[in-house]
UniProtKB/Swiss-Prot annotation:
Its main location: secreted. This is Thiocillin. Keywords: Antibiotic, Antimicrobial, Bacteriocin, Hydroxylation, Methylation, Secreted, Thioether bond. Belongs to the thiocillin family. The record marks 8 as: Not methylated. There is a cross-link at residues 1-10 (Pyridine-2,5-dicarboxylic acid (Ser-Ser) (with C-9)). There is a cross-link at residues 4-5, 8-9 (Thiazole-4-carboxylic acid (Thr-Cys)).
């Protein structure tokens, strides 16, 4: 669930 991430969900690994 990467809604706050501007890039792809793959970028949201943090």
């Amino acid at each position: 669930s990467c809604t706050t991430c501007v890039c792809t969900c793959s970028c949201c690994t943090t």
